[in-house]
Amino acid sequence: MAVRAAVAGASGYAGGELLRLLLTHPEVEIGALTGNSNAGQRLGALQPHLLPLADRVLEATTPEVLGGHDVVFLALPHGQSAAVAEQLGPDVLVVDMGADFRLKDAGDWERFYGSPHAGTWPYGLPELPGARAALEGSKRIAVPGCYPTAVSLALFPAYAASLAEPEAVIVAASGTSGAGKAAKPHLLGSEVMGSMSPYGVGGGHRHTPEMIQNLGAVAGEPVTVSFTPTLAPMPRGILATCTAKAKPGVTAESVRAAYEKALADEPFVHLLPEGQWPATASVYGSNAVQVQVAHDAAAGRIIAISAIDNLAKGTAGGAVQSMNLALGLDETTGLTTIGVAP
């Protein structure tokens, strides 16, 4: 019997990518599609690439519309998911693609998001130690942020093997879709094309506490993170360059061995052959993650680089992967590691 899924926030980039993936998922039947500001409009006018759903009409996001589904995906702006989720029954699998339930520390949430903390749900990054067990059978899932997905998958093997000191410096470039679909002057083509620019510098980006939370949990001690995000002139993709001070005695061989061990059985995270480097173009449209690692002996640092599609593995693909685990399906169901090139 098919799993009936509703999508709240179907008109945005994350909601559109989720629907693209669900259309080819063999176990999912797409139910209600909602979007408050676009209620009453045809989906085809807002997401013209989703031809099989073009004539579906968006409804208001209400408990009555979302009720009666096995799974409800919330692709809503940060701070809006909690009010919707509390109106859904405990037997409904609710997958929040926003930030509302990712952080464990209420102080971090209030400092970075400026509203009361709604709580914490099982975290939808299965590759982290212990995460799969928490997701299996769960009825509530918090999908990670796109930057924390890229950074955590790049660095967790080093911390799991106790190779890195508890401080990391991260510079990550993201495509413009990470900023959402709403019109913003700095995302105009004339502003973005042919240019790169940092933002959220000096610890101001909202994804910073999420990275600290993830890496600290793996390391078993607090990890200091300096994160500088950069806007890149491309629609989608993240390239994260992450460095951490190596502990005494660490070698290139020990680093490589730790990453090979940590990622050997992961269906979506691929450690590239030595000498080959991650590229956002290689994971475009897929749930794949490319990782490469190096040891800078002169500087005494571990350099881990990852590439993801921010809308796929970084959002919608991660949501589907986590849903699969919660429902007892193979976690790769409906997902691909095949990118689109050129």
Swiss-Prot record:
Per the record, the gene is: argC
Superkingdom as given in the UniProt entry: Bacteria
**Swiss-Prot/TrEMBL keywords:** Amino-acid biosynthesis, Arginine biosynthesis, Cytoplasm, NADP, Oxidoreductase
Question: Quick one: where is this thing mainly located?
Answer: cytoplasm
Q: Show the CDD domains listed in the entry.
A: AGPR_1_actinobacAGPR_like, AGPR_1_C
Cell compartment(s), UniProt: Cytoplasm
Protein name per its UniProtKB record? N-acetyl-gamma-glutamyl-phosphate reductase
According to its UniProt record, this protein's enzyme class is oxidoreductase
- The active site consists of 146
Query: Which HAMAP family does the UniProt entry name for this protein?
Result: ArgC_type1
GO: which molecular function terms? N-acetyl-gamma-glutamyl-phosphate reductase activity; NAD binding; NADP+ binding
Catalytic activity, per the record? N-acetyl-L-glutamate 5-semialdehyde + phosphate + NADP(+) = N-acetyl-L-glutamyl 5-phosphate + NADPH + H(+)
